[in-house]
Design a protein with these regions (language model features):
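SDR active-site strand-loop-helix element
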Residues: 32, 62, 99-105, 142-148, ...
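Conserved Rossmann-fold NAD(P)-dependent oxidoreductase catalytic core, especially the SDR/UDP-sugar
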Residues: 127-175
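N-terminal Rossmann NAD(P)H-binding glycine-rich loop of SDR-like oxidoreductase domains
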Residues: 28-48
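Non-catalytic terminal and boundary segments that flank Rossmann-like NAD(P)-dependent oxidoreductase
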Residues: 1-29, 89
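NAD(P)H-binding glycine-rich loop region in Rossmannoid oxidoreductase-like domains
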Residues: 82-121
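Active-site helix of classical SDR
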Residues: 177, 181
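C-terminal substrate-binding subdomain of Rossmann-fold SDR/epimerase-dehydratase oxidoreductases
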Residues: 2, 6, 228-346
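NAD(P)-dependent short-chain dehydrogenase/reductase
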Residues: 154-164, 187-244, 249-260, 285-290
């Protein structure tokens, strides 16, 4: 199928810099959450890698929405499993070597409106994959995509947050279904690694974005990008105090393979681009300055919108970088590519 130019550039960049071709040659890789941003771009990268290097990689993908999958991949050579991750998962057809578990709800309002489903998706889906990994000798590695939200509330700008730090999460707040769900499943992964020697690693991802993000996405970065494209004021529904780093899609995907192939089982690794740490408010002003000075920043705080508590999480990536990973895209380049992508699909 014909791919968007910006996405194709990202895919070709990934393939040109991918250092692990021999390690995954002729292997079968299961990817869950295949129609999400990370899952879909990751699969496209693997398919392109096959074309360029003739690696014989087999991709098995889990997704719920057939039409969305067809829109993303057309008739590409992917072996599909059509189901929700809370349903019993039958992998008996394949000898899976690697699992990259991307499936997760990502919308804040979903966590608030469907906390039970949020928890079940995290726990039941991951437990099935860990069970498979514990019982099949073909398994070489698994990465679980966790989140910086598993850290909870931390408000300290003075130090980089390392993987051994833990902040407070209120267990009787429905929005905690996501953050506590991620924390719980990290514990589950560590337990399987410890007791059953499952080679699973946890990736604590910061906010990841890039070409391929839906124009319907309601996350802050997407709303801000669309505002500067349309020449509209950037309207914030919080004070914008929360701060975190960011990571471009292909940089994050590259990190997942470093963890899959070089990470220590049972351990968690922060995934973020150094020197991108910024508050939401400062990000708004940065985008206005860099991309459309005719826009203004307007603050209209509202309650009960499902937003996370104020946190200031500057993640340390030394542990990941020690494996050899390094990012290629800085914050301005990330938004430049996202904005150009949005313009290309208008």
């Amino acid at each position: 199928m014909i791919e968007n130019l910006i996405i194709q550039q990202d895919i070709d960049f990934f393939v040109g810099h991918f250092p692990f071709v021999e390690q995954i040659k002729e292997k079968t890789i299961l990817v869950t959450g295949a129609t999400g941003l990370i899952g879909s771009v990751l699969i496209k990268c693997l398919l392109r890698l096959n074309q360029v290097t003739n690696s014989g990689i087999k991709v098995v993908a889990v997704a719920r929405n057939k039409q969305k999958a067809y829109d993303l991949f057309g008739n590409c050579e992917i072996q599909w499993i059509w189901q929700d991750m809370t349903e019993p998962l039958d992998l008996s057809t394949w000898d899976i070597h690697y699992i990259i578990h991307c499936a997760s709800p990502t919308a804040s309002q979903f966590y608030v409106n469907s906390p039970v489903e949020t928890i079940n998706t995290a726990f039941i889906g991951t437990r099935q994959l860990l069970e498979y990994a514990s019982q099949h000798l073909s398994m070489r590695g698994m990465v679980y995509l966790s989140s910086l939200e598993s850290y909870g509330t931390i408000n300290d700008n003075s130090v980089l947050v390392t993987e051994d730090v833990s902040g407070y999460i209120n267990p009787i707040d429905v929005r905690s279904s996501y953050s506590l769900g991620k924390r719980m499943v990290e514990c589950l992964c560590h337990a399987y690694a410890s007791e059953y020697h499952v080679p699973v690693v946890m990736a604590r991802l910061t906010q990841v974005f890039g070409a391929g993000v839906s124009r319907q996405n309601t996350k802050v970065f997407a709303q801000f990008a669309k505002s500067v494209i349309n020449g509209q004021d950037i309207v914030m529904h919080t004070s914008g105090e929360s701060a975190k780093p960011y990571c471009y899609t292909v940089d994050a995907i590259m990190a997942l393979f470093y963890l899959l192939l070089k990470g220590e089982p049972g351990k968690a690794y922060n995934v973020a681009t150094p020197n991108t740490y910024i508050s939401i408010c400062d990000l708004a002003y940065l985008l206005v300055e860099k991309f459309n000075k005719n826009c203004r920043v307007v603050i209209e705080a509202r309650d009960n919108m499902g937003y996370a508590p104020v946190t200031k999480l500057n993640l340390s990536t030394k542990k990941l970088e020690a494996l050899g990973w390094k990012p290629f895209f800085n914050l301005e380049e990330m938004f430049d590519r996202l904005i150009n992508y949005y313009k290309s699909i208008q």
